[in-house]
Amino acid sequence: MTISFGLGTLIIKDARAPGPLYTYYMTRRDLAKLAGATALLQKQVVAADTPKYTGALDGFMDKVNGAGFDPVLFTHKLYESAALRLSFQATNRKDAEQWQRNLKAKISELLGGFPLKRPPLLSQTLEVREFPGYRREKFVFQSRTDSWVLGYLLTPKPARALNATMVCVTGHGRGVDDIVGIDEKGQDRTVKEGYAYDFAIQAVEHGMAAVAIEPMAFGCRRDAITKAHNLTASACQPAAGAALLLGQTMIGWRVYDVMRTIDWIETRPELDAHRVGCMGISGGGTCTMFAAVFEPRIRAAMVSCYLNTFRDSIMSVSHCIDNYVPGILNWAEMYDVAGLIAPRPLFVESGERDTIFPIEASRASFERVKKIYEVFGAGALTEQETFDGPHSFWGKRGLPFLARHLAV
């Protein structure tokens, strides 16, 4: 098909047809406008065909070792010789338990350790709301001196004593609001949205109470400069960076908040502190995995869209600084860390179209975790579900798994 201009006309032809398909009679002004638009379009087509400038080596890559300028390839080469000194090797339960003690001690050191003395909780209820299927209480407590946690307690109706309880930890985004049914305007919503799909409410729908906490550097736990940007901007860069400067980590800080949340659960008569689980997605999955390692009061855990290898996720794809533990690859891979939860029940779910925690590495990592569980004689206590979806909460098998193992 061709377009041509005649005197006062626009002619559209098709080579397969004997004559013009269309002839439009136009004023000179219309033709001038159309000609200008056509010229602009031609420039855009030429620009689209022109390779985008990527740096000073454009046009010289055939003259240099191009791979030598790629930092990710460089780190992958370093990974090949990573020590992984405490990666799992045991073949019997006795050796496996000793391995757990050794690796837990090392990872605790890498995280920056945990406070030996816990300050009083000084908890305070801020608000109570009633909904058709549950009751929602907003509360705060002191985690560390000068560091406070906001949370929501969701208890199912009708009210009963000693509810099995899930600690729910969200990932990057708007913070805890996004898992308890609160929209970006602070209003209640009835449709489960976002990539986390209000999974704290879903836990309640499966018969458990949910204690959803605001992770440090998200939501209301951000500095004033970050809050001024938008609801989804995290304060991880200044806060997690500061942790590293102090020889600590954001993961360690968030894990300690989970420990303190369970301290708070123990003060509530309607919650059964002997039936506590922990679940989280993405960065909340990170927190859940590490918290389950160090907090024995967590009886079952669900890690959504996190379990992978360090190599194929945070070492290969751009991720937030809050994910990193200095020196951990000298000692272990991610599957080793997850194996420290054994033999307590662990459920893992992974999206087949997750671009930041690639599915093949998730599957391979889980197989390594399962082998650790098998050495403990607990192979049936860990499961993975892969689903046809992106980086998002699924819960189809995971929530029933948690309810079953917490005797709901």
What do these predicted ranges mean?
Residues S147-W148, K157-T165:
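Proline/glycine-enriched tight loop/beta-turn segments at coil->beta junctions
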Residues M1-T27:
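N-terminal secretory signal peptides
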Residues E367-R368, Y373-V408:
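C-terminal catalytic histidine-bearing segment of alpha/beta-hydrolase fold enzymes
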Residues L271-G280:
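Alpha/beta-hydrolase fold nucleophile elbow
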Residues P238, A242-L246, R260-T261, I298-G339, ...:
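Mobile cap/lid helix-loop segments that gate and shape the active-site cleft of serine hydrolases
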Residues H76-T155:
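Non-catalytic accessory segments flanking enzyme active sites
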Residues D30-D49:
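N-terminal export signals
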Residues C168-Y256, S313-M315:
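Cap/lid segment of the alpha/beta-hydrolase catalytic domain
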